Amino acid sequence: MTLDVDAQKKDEKLLLATIHQEYKILAEYKMIESEKVSGIYVIPSYANSLQWFGVFFGRQGFYENSVFRFSILLPDGFPQDKTTPAIVFQQNVVHPLVCPFTNSLDISHAFPEWRCGEDHLWQVLKYMQVIFADPLECIRSVGSTQELSNVEASKLLTTNRDAFAALVQESIAESKAHIYDTPPTEDPHYIVFEKFQEDIHGPVLEQIRNGRTTNSPAESGGGGAATGLSWVKVKEGEFKPLSIE
C-alpha cells in the first residue's frame, strides 16, 4: 500500500513538473510573438514541445532571398538546464558559425550557458538574424577563427568574398530545391510550403494588401491560428511569405 502511495505521489510530482515546463515553454513562445523578429517563423512541435520547427528568410546581404529550414532542440530540463538550445538546419548552410558536418549553428559565443530567467528564445532568434545579416561582424566578435564552426567559410569570407558568396548561393539553391518536399514528419505543426495557386491564395494576398489579416503562420511565433497549425504560402518563384511586413 505504501509503495502504491509513493508511486502515485511520484507520478503527481512528475505531472506537475511537466505542466510547469509546458507553461514556461508557452511563455517563451508568447515572448517571441511580442518581439516580432522579422523573417523568422517558429512554432513548437505538436508532439514534443522541446522540439520547434523554424524557417529563416534572409532579407539582406549575402543571404538575401534565402529560405532555410531549421529545428530548435531544447534540453530536457529547459529552462533550468544550463545547456543552451541547439539550432540545426535541415540543409547545408554556408556560414562561419554553422558546422558543415552537422548543420548545427554555434550560439555559444553569445550564450555560453543558459541562464534561466535571463536568456530567452527570442534573443536566440535575434542573434540568428544578426549573424546572417552581417557574417563578417560575427567573425570579428568571436575573435579567433579557430573557434568558428566553419573555418574554411570564414577564411573565404575574409579573403575572397566572391567565392564565399558563390558557395552561399549554392546552399541557398539547394535549400530552395527542397522547399516543397514531402514533410519528414506527420506533426501538424510542421511548417509546410504550398505552391502559389491564384484561386486559393489570391484572395488571401488581396486581403493582406488591403490591410486585413487572416489566420496565418507565426512570424517569430507571431499569432498563429487557434488550432496551432502553422503554414506559409509563397508565390511561386519568389519564396516570400505572404505577410504584411
Swiss-Prot record:
Domain UBC core residues, every copy: 20-177
Superkingdom field: Eukaryota
SUPFAM superfamilies: UBC-like
Stored InterPro entries: UBQ-conjugat_E2_core (IPR000608), UBQ-conjugating_enzyme/RWD (IPR016135)
CDD domains given in the database record: UEV_AKTIP
Disulfide bonds: none
Family: Belongs to the ubiquitin-conjugating enzyme family. FTS subfamily.
Stated name of the protein: Protein crossbronx
